[in-house]
Amino acid sequence: MELKEVKVFLERLDQDSINFDPHFYKRTIERPVNEGLVRNFLGRIDRLEKIEYGKIGRFKLWFKMSSKYSLVLIVEIKETKELKVVSAWNTNRKWQDKLKG
């Protein structure tokens, strides 16, 4: 799937088609991220900043949470038109900008 197709897929995504990997729940214990937050941002494509390729069939989605933080999601898009959230975390935008610069 091409990156442009990912955005179109997300725009048409139904909340019932979003599933969460057990790894996601394991990591939410350690991180200030929950299922409701992820579902909220997946429904707000206007906050989507960047899409990157990951492992085969996986993508990294960057959503702008605020001027200080971004929400990063690792997702799999299934042929059945379902989206599986594998992992999620928030990251400091200043820190990310320093890594780029």
For the regions a language model picked out, list residue spans one by one.
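Ribonuclease/tRNase effector modules and their secretory precursors
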Residues: 1-101
